[in-house]
Amino acid sequence: YRIGVTPTLGPYLLPQVLPEIHKRFQALRLFVREGVPAELSQDLRSAKHDLILSTQPIAESGLDVSPLFRESLKLVLPLDHRLASKDVINRMDLVGEEVLTLDEHHLYHRQVTELCQTLGANTRRDFEGTSLDTLRQMVVMGMGITFLPALYVASEIRETDPLRVADVFGVNMYRDHALAWRSRS
């Protein structure tokens, strides 16, 4: 099977689930390719993929979509940020903050931008990352704060990293993931 995944999900979820899938279905061959959600949906429709694992929304025309799970987003700050030492960070603390995000070609950019609008924060347009790793490194260098998916945080951020990872109280921060396939397959 040819599976398309988003680069902000696949590398952090698949290592947790593929070993069990291979254990249960030893003859199953999976070919994984990353892409942004719009490309993945198009590639699924044109039969370049058999399945896609993506963040919602997935353009559903001609596709069957099965919601899988909701993933929380975490606030990530450099240790010298004014909020890093607070025991509890609430939504009002983020009003006016400049938030780093991925470039606009990623669905994650839109999700973070919408979250920032809800919080009264602003996305930085002068520095945009091309990967979640880039965002993490930009925060380490003190270039700003960001929101990172919980699966990424669990996989890539260590206690020894010079970062504070926090929840923000008073706002639901999450993204939804789904599996999609062609309706006729």
Please describe what each predicted stretch is.
Residues Y1-S61, G129:
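Central regulatory/effector-binding core of bacterial HTH transcription factors
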Residues E98-L119:
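Secondary-structure junction motif
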Residues R2-G4, I52, V76, L100, ...:
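Short, well-ordered beta-strand segments
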Residues I3, D43-R45, L94, Q137-M143, ...:
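Hydrophobic residues within well-ordered alpha-helices
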Residues L28, L44-S54, L73, A121, ...:
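Alpha-to-beta junction loops
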Residues D64-K74, A150, E159-M173:
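Short beta-strand->loop
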Residues E60-V99:
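Flexible hinge/capping segments at coil-to-helix
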